[in-house]
């Protein structure tokens, strides 16, 4: 599946399946370097909706998604930048502000991997990065669990009403 800007969740960040397009499946030959793996970090290079630059997402499954020209794959230097810390760093307000200020064009704005690398940020030592990244990832995982629970509450309510009706009858 070809990644698009529709794979970025504008409300809170993260990955979402793109259901707005029908031409997402690519059947041609793809070089291995463009096939993404579970956990890879991606960020958009084009801003079709205000606030999209600096959004980050993680690839949910290996071998299913391919990188497109509007999406950058973020690679962290081993031992220098923690993968989880980087995910949150790119989506931080300080990086997003810099990307927005440096974006080209006025209507549909663009950035580049070089402009992302040029952002000025404070980065703690690697062990602190790992701790921060782990804590933020744990919080996001708990939020995802709570959302799934909330999504199931209406079904639980219907089940309870059905059970209540059977008890009364």
Language-model regions: role of each:
Residues 69-71:
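Glycine- and aromatic-enriched periplasmic loops at the membrane-periplasm interface
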Residues 1, 6-41:
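Sequence-specific dsDNA recognition surfaces
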Residues 49-58:
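Short, Lys/Arg- and Gly-enriched loop/turn segments at beta-strand edges
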Residues 77-98:
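Glycine- and charge-enriched low-complexity intrinsically disordered segments
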Residues 82-86, 115-159:
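Amphipathic alpha-helical segments
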Residues 1, 74, 169:
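Conserved aromatic/hydrophobic "specificity hotspots" at molecular recognition or selectivity sites
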């Amino acid at each position: 599946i070809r990644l698009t800007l529709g794979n970025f969740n504008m409300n809170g960040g993260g990955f979402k399946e793109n259901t707005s397009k029908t031409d997402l499946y690519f059947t041609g030959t793809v070089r291995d370097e463009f096939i993404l793996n579970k956990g890879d970090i991606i960020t958009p290079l084009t801003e079709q909706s205000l606030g999209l630059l600096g959004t980050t997402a993680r690839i949910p499954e290996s071998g299913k998604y391919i990188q497109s020209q509007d999406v950058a794959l973020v690679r962290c230097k081993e031992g220098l930048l923690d993968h989880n810390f980087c995910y949150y760093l790119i989506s931080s307000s300080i990086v997003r502000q810099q990307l927005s200020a440096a974006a080209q064009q006025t209507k549909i704005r663009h950035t580049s991997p070089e402009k992302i690398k040029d952002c000025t940020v404070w980065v703690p030592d690697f062990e602190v990065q790992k701790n921060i990244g782990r804590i933020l990832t744990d919080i996001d995982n708990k939020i995802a669990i709570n959302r799934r629970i909330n999504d199931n509450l209406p079904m639980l309510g219907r089940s309870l009403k059905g059970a209540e009706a059977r008890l009364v009858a």
